[in-house]
Regions:
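Residue-identity detector for threonine
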Residues: 14, 52-54, 59, 65, ...
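Short inter-helical turns and helix N-cap capping residues of alpha-solenoid HEAT/ARM repeat scaffolds
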Residues: 15-17, 57-58, 93-94, 126-127, ...
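Structural detector for internal amphipathic alpha-helices that build alpha-solenoid repeat scaffolds
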Residues: 19-40, 60-76, 95-111, 129-143, ...
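N-terminal "cap/leader" segments of large eukaryotic alpha-helical scaffolds
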Residues: 1-29
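Amphipathic alpha-helical scaffolding segments comprising HEAT/armadillo-like alpha-solenoid repeats
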Residues: 1-11, 36-53, 75-90, 110-124, ...
Length: 224
């Protein structure tokens, strides 16, 4: 398949009036036909496609193209293109597009060399839909930067105001946190809000399972 054919197929797939029938839908044909195109070339075609569609009316097109980019990264992770995807979070302002992008990123395993600053910024967004999605997506990166972005929310003490942020942050820290995070999480183990309490307790348990050699060092004095 030539680049021109590929872009035409993208045009069909991202069109608002695209065909829905599974066997004939552009989305289905997209994943069947491009096998003859090198994956490295696919990435650059997608990036160019996104960067050249900057108008407001192109929002839907970019959103669908991000879905394709996310699927391709899931199939063949390339740090350079993963970085491009994350950096694009700063270029979009539609909360539904950002939510969709974050959903794609959350399914990836972000390489350690990728800068997640734009993802961290989204985790403090004024838009709750974006903020909540971003906090959960931080779990895709096992980096200190990601952990610190999650700790920002776990350190909050107003559990009523930041209930959902704490629930999501506790859960994520359970998967990417280190032994030193146990004491931070234990601040919420006796929360009056059940979901905050349960996610904190589960996170502590999960970290201890992953770092058993350090678990005793993190045992609170009251537990001795």
């Amino acid at each position: 398949m030539r680049k021109e054919e590929f872009c035409k197929l993208l045009d069909e797939m991202t069109s608002p009036d695209r065909v829905i029938d599974l066997l004939h839908a552009p989305n289905w044909r997209f994943w069947q036909k491009p096998q003859k195109i090198d994956e490295g070339q696919l990435f650059y075609i997608l990036r160019e496609y996104i960067e050249t569609r900057t108008k407001k009316e192109d929002t839907h097109i970019r959103e669908n193209t991000y879905l394709v980019l996310g699927k391709l990264l899931l199939r063949a992770m390339e740090p350079e293109h993963c970085q491009f995807f994350i950096d694009r979070l700063a270029e979009e302002n539609d909360k539904y597009v950002l939510h969709s992008m974050l959903g794609c990123i959350s399914r990836l395993r972000i390489p350690p060399e990728v800068n997640i600053s734009e993802l961290a910024a989204c985790s403090r967004s004024d838009q709750w839909l974006v903020r909540h999605s971003a906090i959960q997506t931080l779990g895709a990166s096992d980096s200190e930067a990601s952990r610190e972005a999650v700790r920002y929310w776990v350190r909050h003490t107003d559990e009523k105001k930041f209930k959902f942020e704490l629930i999501y942050a506790n859960a994520v820290l359970g998967y990417i946190g280190v032994a030193e995070d146990i004491m931070l999480l234990e601040n919420h183990i006796h929360s009056r809000i059940r979901d905050v309490r349960d996610t904190a307790a589960y996170a502590v348990e999960n970290i201890r399972k992953r770092v058993p050699a350090l678990s005793e060092e993190q045992t609170p004095a009251g537990g001795l």
